[in-house]
Curated annotation (Swiss-Prot):
Keyword terms, alphabetized: Ribonucleoprotein, Ribosomal protein
Annotated protein name in UniProt: Large ribosomal subunit protein bL31B
Biological process according to GO: translation
Record gene name: rpmE2
Positions of transmembrane segments: none
Record bears the keyword NADP: no
GO cellular component: ribonucleoprotein complex; ribosome
Family from the record: Belongs to the bacterial ribosomal protein bL31 family. Type B subfamily.
Pfam families: Ribosomal_L31
Highest taxon listed in the record's lineage: Bacteria
PANTHER family assigned: 50S RIBOSOMAL PROTEIN L31, CHLOROPLASTIC, LARGE RIBOSOMAL SUBUNIT PROTEIN BL31C
Complex formation: Part of the 50S ribosomal subunit.
Length: 84
């Protein structure tokens, strides 16, 4: 491999924003926030909207994710379509 062309690959903690579940894995992503892991080390913390802990495909639960009233905004703008 060529030297100095690959991004820094390091341990990172990802946190699910809706469930609070955390995962320690390796990634090239960086963050200013940090988290203290159970091994006593501090790692960069990245908060994500959806993980396998909250995604309906993996949880088997169906739910509507309406962020900041986007559905209502769409319905106000274009109207609600009625089924025949």
């Amino acid at each position: 491999m060529k030297a100095n062309i690959h991004p820094d690959y390091h341990p990172v903690v990802f946190q699910d924003a809706s469930t609070g579940t955390t995962f320690l894995t390796r990634s090239t992503v960086t963050s200013d926030r940090t988290a203290l892991w159970s091994d006593g080390n501090t790692y960069p913390l990245v908060v994500v909207d959806v993980t396998s802990e909250s995604h309906p495909f993996w949880t088997g639960a169906q739910r509507v994710m309406d962020t900041a009233g986007r559905v209502e905004k769409f319905e106000r703008r274009y109207g609600v379509r009625k089924r025949p």
